[in-house]
Amino acid sequence: MKNKIFLAAILLTPILVVLFSSMYFTFGMSPDGTKNNGVFFNNYFEFNQFKNAEENRDLVEFEDGKWVLSVYVTNMDKSIESIYLMRQLNVALNRDINKLKRIVFYSDNALDIKMIDLQDQYPRIEIIKDKNGTLLDVLQVNSNISFIKENPIFVIDPYGRAVMYFDPETDPKLMLCLLYTSDAADDTPC
């Protein structure tokens, strides 16, 4: 008799755990937010849909397994703070600095000369021209803020999916925590 009760308790414990946790989340006890400190896009999107001007290769290659911090520049004065912050976040990763790539996208021909100056100022940054502006359109549709006005930093995972962006008011230390808790860094100070 004791063995049957013990066996029943062992067999029912996992079922009860799953049942109670499901009920806990179903009846409104789920967490309100996430700890990523960013804002998820309405729908994540793959970057392999964006091609270069000749339509023969991807706008960005993701074969190196690096996380990507990006800014879409529409106004150089608005975006310079985001570009500088990307550099500071990259430097703050210390020995994991090579696990992150920084990319600046733009489509306005009037910014060509400013992009050359930007490349001189930040030599390790990759600058990509989105000739037809389709990336900007997709960013606008999938976000809750105006990418044209704000020029925020957005994150692309190593598989080529744009998953989140950061509001311009987000504390840089919180952004760094996301990079530390992802595969972009080995040591986690957060």
Predicted segment positions?
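Structural beta-sheet core signal
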Residues: 71, 102-105, 155
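Short, internal strand/loop/helix patches
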Residues: 103, 115-150
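Structural microenvironment flanking redox-active thiols in thiol-disulfide oxidoreductases
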Residues: 77, 81-121
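Thiol/disulfide oxidoreductase modules built on the thioredoxin-like
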Residues: 135-176
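N-terminal targeting signals for export/organelle localization
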Residues: 1-51
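Short active-site neighborhood of thiol/selenol oxidoreductases, capturing the structured segment around
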Residues: 62-78
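Conserved small/polar residues in nucleotide/adenosyl-binding loops
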Residues: 180-185
